[in-house]
Amino acid sequence: MRRMAKYDRSYSMQDAHGPNGLARRGTQRGCSRSKSTRRGNLGTIASLTFSQKQALNLSWRLLKPQASACFRKIFLELEIASPKVKQIFYKAALVDAFNKDDDNTATLEVHIKLTTKFFDELLATLDDENEFVAKIRGIGSAHAILAKGSNFSSDIWERLGEIAMERVCSHEVVTKTREASRAWRTLIAILIDELRGGFEGELRQHRKSSSTDQIEMGKVEDEEELHSKLQQLRMDYNQTLPYT
């Protein structure tokens, strides 16, 4: 079973003090960075109530005009928390400076635009969990290529989740209603868990393919070495034959 993210989906959609709720002590902002103390009863999109889905869509419509500013703060905080991310964005900006034909999807500015578009598409799939999960994991797997060259690792997703949880859940649009606050906590927890799952799954495939290639290369090298040694033996043997 895949290891669970620190941002557990057990950010309950039930009242924190309800009979089945998860007792949590949040920050004054209405959203805590603290980890869940429970691993069971994971929230899923299917477990969101109709009113919570409505709250997500309504609050997103109100939040969207300010989304660019919100996501910019999230990514800038992530740069501070993870120098690897800052380096990736910096390199992308340098490349983009010399390429005016197309948008470089690795830059900070384009990430902000794509994240806004991503939430538009994601919230449209709340009633189709398979498509919802596939969309998120696809984004996660696309980042696996950064693991080798840029040392991108799973802990970056965790940091992103912590920052996003605090920034989004503390936004006045989200804190207006209890349903919206619960729903966004659940959404972000699932989002980070699936992003990391897609990333780690693709990374395992890369490593498996790399390992297989190394084994095959090793076989070829062994065969070439054996062939070379046989040739040398023949040469040595021929040199020892008496002249007739």
UniProtKB/Swiss-Prot annotation:
Coiled-coil spans in chain: none
Q: Biological process (GO) annotations?
A: oxygen transport; response to hypoxia
Q: Does the keyword Cell wall biogenesis/degradation apply?
A: no
A Pfam family it matches: Globin
Q: Domain named Globin: which ranges? A: 47-200
Disulfide cysteine pairs (residue numbers): none
Query: What keywords appear on the UniProt entry?
Result: Heme, Iron, Metal-binding, Oxygen transport, Transport
Task: Give the binding site residues for heme.
Answer: H111, H143
Q: Which domain of life is it from?
A: Eukaryota
Q: Which GO terms describe its molecular function?
A: heme binding; metal ion binding; oxygen binding; oxygen carrier activity
Span list, region Disordered: 1-38
Q: Which protein family is it in?
A: Belongs to the globin family.
- Its name, as the record gives it, is Globin-like protein 9
Organism encoding this protein: Caenorhabditis briggsae
Q: Which gene encodes it?
A: glb-9
